[in-house]
Amino acid sequence: MRLALWMYQGTAHHGVGRIANSMRGVHAVFHAPQGDDYVNPIFTMLERTPDFPRMTTSIVSGRDLAQGTVRLPETLRAVDAQVHPDLIIVCASCSTILLQEDLERMARSAGTSAEVLVYDANPYRMQEVRSADGLLTTLVQRFARPQAPLPTPSVNILGPASLGFHNRSDLICLRRMLATLGVQINVVAPLGASIHDLERLPAAWATIAPYRELGQNAARWLEDQFGIPALTDAPIGVQPTLRWLRRLVETLNEAGARLQRLSTPLRLPPLTAFSLDGMSAPSSVPWFARTADMESYSMKRAFVFGDATHTVGMVKFLRDELGMQIAGAGTYLEEEAEWVYQELKEYLPPDDSGSPKSSFLATDVFQHVARRIADLSPELVCGTQMERHACRKLDIPCLVIAPPTHIENHLLSYRPVLGFDGADVLADAVYTTATLGMEKHLIDMFGDAGLDYDEPQTGEPRTENQELRVENRASANGHPEAGVSVGAAEPSAAPSRSVVTEESNRATTPSSSTVHPVWTPDAQAMLKKIPFFVRGRVQKNVERYAMQHGYATITAEVLVEAREALGG
C-alpha cells in the first residue's frame, strides 16, 4: 500500500464508511489505532449533509495491546446505547487487521440489542470500491426477503452512496425521468435505505444499477435469486439516455407480462415531457453541438481518465455528441480495465500497427497518468482531482469527471451526470473548462488596455515553456517512486543580432535527448504571433523536432522548417 503517496481509492474501511454513512439505522465501528480515524473527518469535510458521519472508531492503543485490554465490546455497547442503530458493522483497519484478532468473539461478548455484522474488509486484498460494493452485496444477500411483486411498474435503484460523484443529483434526475414514465421507485440503496428497506427489494419489477463500481453485483444477485431483471447501463449523454429509456420501458413491459400485472403496456411519452418546463427539448446538446463555438471543438483533443463508469460515458459523450477527438483514455480500476478497454477500443486512436492498446492506460500510479498527459498535450483533460493537480502544473484545462474529488465537486446545487439534464451539465462543463484563448489572444494582439496582465519578463514564452519532468527518486522506504515536478527552462543568453547558420546550430557532442534548445529572439517573436491556445503545442513540437534533428538553437528558420515538417 502506497500510504506515502496520493491514492485514487481510499482504504477498505473507507468503503465500509461510505455504505454505513449512506444508510439509516446503520452505524460502522472501526477497530483501529488513533491514526486510522482519518475516515471520519473526510466525511465531515466533503459530505454536504447536516448529519454527523455514522461511524465510530474504537481506538486500539499500544498500552491496550501490552495489557491485553480490548475496548471493542465497550465501544459497541456505547454506540448501541447512544445511537440505537438497527445494525452495527464492525471492521478492522489496515493496521489492526495485522493483529489477527477474533472480532466475531469480541462482538458477541458485547451483548448489544442491535444486530452486529463483522465485515472482513481486508485492506491487503481490496480497496474502497471493492470493499463498498462487497458490503452492499452482503447486506442485500443478508436482508432481502421474498416479496409479492408490487401491483404497478416499479424499480429499485442501487448504487447512489455517500461521497459518490454527483450521486445525489443523479438520483434526482433518475426520479424525475421515472416519474415522467409513471414508474414507482421501490427502494433506493444504499443512500437513504434502512435494513427494513433492503427486505423489500424483491418486490420491484426491475433494478436500475447505473454505476459499475457500486450496486451491479447486488443487482445481479437479485436477478439470479428472484428473477428481477437488472439494467446496468449508465445513461450518460442524450443518445445513451434515449436508449436507456427505451430499454427500461421494454424491460418493464416484459416483466409486467410475466407477472400478469400490466393491463396497458408502458410507452415513451413525447420527449418534451422530460424537460424541466415540460414544453421544450429535454436537452440542448444536439443543437448546441452544431453551433460555431462547438464546431471548433472538432479539432480539439481530449484525454479521459477515471473510474470505469464515468470514463466510458465521458469518452463516448465527447466523441459522439460533441465531436471532439479522443487522444487517449484510461482507468485506475485495474480490475475493470478490460471492460473499459472493450467499451472504448473503437474510440481510441490506433498506433502504427493499427492497435488502440497504446492509447489506453490502466494504472493506479498518478505519476504515470501525469506523464501520459504531458506526452499527449491535449486541449482538455477529463479526470480526477489528481489530474487537476497535474494539469495545473502543465497549464492544461482539466475537468473533474470521476472520484477522487475535492470539496468543489460536492455541490449543493443540482449538477447531475446522468440523463438529459446531465448531458447539459457536461456540455457546459466542457465548454467552460476548455480554453478558447480568445481573451489572451486579443490582449496579445491589441495590448492589455490598462488591465492587470503580467507579460513574462524573462523574454521566454509564457508558461507553455514549462515542461513536466518525471523523475525516479528513492522514497523514504527505499523503493523508487515517480515524482512530478515542474520547472521552466533555464534562461540562456542568445546573441542579439548574430546570424546562426545551420552548420553551427547543430548540436555536436551532447545527445539530442539531453540538450534543451535555446530560442533566439526572432524565433520567440515569431512564436508569439501564433494564437495563444495552440502556441504551447507548437512550441513543444518545435522543441522536440529540434532535439531530434540536433539543433541546439531554435531560430526563425528552424521554426519554419519544423512547422513545414510537422504539417502546421
From Swiss-Prot:
Signal peptide location: none
Catalytic activity: chlorophyllide a + oxidized 2[4Fe-4S]-[ferredoxin] + 2 ADP + 2 phosphate = protochlorophyllide a + reduced 2[4Fe-4S]-[ferredoxin] + 2 ATP + 2 H2O
Enzyme class: oxidoreductase
Annotated EC: 1.3.7.7
Catalytic site positions: D293 (proton donor)
Cofactor note as given: Binds 1 [4Fe-4S] cluster per heterodimer. The cluster is bound at the heterodimer interface by residues from both subunits.
Single GO molecular function: oxidoreductase activity, acting on iron-sulfur proteins as donors
Pathway: Porphyrin-containing compound metabolism; bacteriochlorophyll biosynthesis (light-independent)
Residue sites binding substrate per the record: G437, M438
GO biological process terms held by the UniProt record: light-independent bacteriochlorophyll biosynthetic process; photosynthesis, dark reaction
Keyword annotations from UniProtKB, A to Z: 4Fe-4S, ATP-binding, Bacteriochlorophyll biosynthesis, Chlorophyll biosynthesis, Iron, Iron-sulfur, Metal-binding, Nucleotide-binding, Oxidoreductase, Photosynthesis
Biased composition (Polar residues): 498-515
Matching Pfam families: Oxidored_nitro (PF00148), PCP_red (PF08369)
Listed cofactors: [4Fe-4S] cluster
Residues reported to bind [4Fe-4S] cluster: D36
Family: Belongs to the ChlB/BchB/BchZ family.
Quaternary structure and partners: Protochlorophyllide reductase is composed of three subunits; BchL, BchN and BchB. Forms a heterotetramer of two BchB and two BchN subunits.
NCBIfam families linked to this entry: DPOR_BchB, PRK02910.1-3
Function: Component of the dark-operative protochlorophyllide reductase (DPOR) that uses Mg-ATP and reduced ferredoxin to reduce ring D of protochlorophyllide (Pchlide) to form chlorophyllide a (Chlide). This reaction is light-independent. The NB-protein (BchN-BchB) is the catalytic component of the complex.
Protein name: Light-independent protochlorophyllide reductase subunit B
